[in-house]
Amino acid sequence: MQSKPLSAVALGLASISFVAADTTVTINAKSNNGVWEGWGTSLAWWAQAFGDRDDLADIFFTTTTVNFSNVELPGLGLNIVRHNAGASSTTPVGSDSMVVSPSIKPSRQVMGHWIDWNSADPTSSSWNWDIDLKQRSMMQKAHARGADRFELFSNSPMWWMTSNHNPSGDAKGGENIQSWNTAQHAVYLANIAKYAKDNWNITFESVEPLNEPSADWWKADGTQEGCHIDISTQASIIGSLRSELNDRGLQGAFISASDENTYDQAVKTLKSLGDDALNNIGRINVHGYQYGDGDRAGVLQIAVDRGLRLWNSEYGENDATGQQLVSNLIQDFRWLKPTGWVYWQVLDGGGWGVIDADNDAGTVGAANQKYFVLAQFSRHIRDGMQILDGGADNVVAAYDNANEKLVIVAVNWGDAQNLVFDLSQFTQASTDGAVVTRWRTQLGSGDQYIKSTEVTMTGTTFSAAFEQNMVETFEIKNVKI
């Protein structure tokens, strides 16, 4: 969810050296920070407006080059899709109807399928499967283009499950799910997962019943759907969801939790959920809104101790230059070590999207520089690759075992300099004189995604020139661990 972004002076770069002299970085070939599962985006809210657009599906979910507004855009190649189970409905239940926050935009109201409490049977008239068509359409377009990891997530229970019938939150930001509806929330999500598998040709690999549940800003006058849920209630919902998924033959779908807003809150929540709940979780999801701060290593340690997978399942900010994105993303690779990474809104205004858009007006503008920064990572570090220790706080590395290819992404924050990359730890560091393909993006403005082939191997090293505030990606073939 959107939160106040850090200023440019708080980009979390304190650990990166600002030096003009040439710097040598040694890639650690013996390291293994996990097998990469992919890059993704959440479909709410942008797909509600643009879910019928094939050109946008091509841009986000393929690596082909797409002509978009007379500009050739390199497709981002996202393969993770987070589909939102809506909480809103315009259908009253008896004398009750949904209370709408005075501050919420229509584009942020996601229509839910369980429109009244009369029946839990998904084939009954209490369920409406003909709403939210555009979000579903984009999910299916993504699937047709090769996206292979789908997660169902909830921002709030259905409005009629909340204490005040307002899916934006409680008046004071307290818990807003009725105690007798915690199990019903699990039924809701399990029914969607089952229906999607049987009718939409979509198998949700994971289901997340919570979203930033410990936050106290989910209030009745909020700008989006959200719900504070106490720790004990979170644990209860997780247990109920496991049972409901199993009852529908969805034992293969695992539960992720708890999508807390910050790394620090994630640590607190995970330490408080209890063994029963944690034993029902297959992956830790955490959001990246602590930006350059927070206990990334603490979240990782819990994941390691519990044998759980780990994703940064939501990240976003309003810095269209790409500076915050590359800084925080590299810190995630360095200290959080997730195996999946999801950008919140690829289409949005005010710098939040990687392509400018107004989801309410239905207008789409141009790709910003952040788009091309994300492309440096998402187009080259692909699912199935082994993440390596890049050897420095400004370097990320990944190894493609099937194709014997090494990928390095690096940023130079200081004065222009050459970075020398040492591959001597590999059993085969390509060959002397081999071409190293390079792509470069200038943060802020300038070069967007420029490919060149002038860099070559010299023995087991290669050197590349970096301007200040430049991101570069290198692909080195014929490398063996």
Where do the protein language model's features map onto the residues?
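N-terminal catalytic cores of secreted or lumenal carbohydrate-active enzymes
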Residues: 22, 28-204
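Solvent-exposed beta-hairpin/edge-strand motifs
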Residues: 426-448
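Active-site neighborhood of glycoside hydrolase catalytic domains
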Residues: 184-203, 213-318
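C-terminal beta-strand-rich structural cap/linker in extracellular carbohydrate-active enzymes
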Residues: 453-481
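Structural recognition of the beta-strand scaffold that forms the well-ordered cores
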Residues: 35-43, 79-85, 89-94, 149-154, ...
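Fungal secretory targeting signals
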Residues: 1-22, 481
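Carbohydrate-binding surface patches
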Residues: 390-430, 469
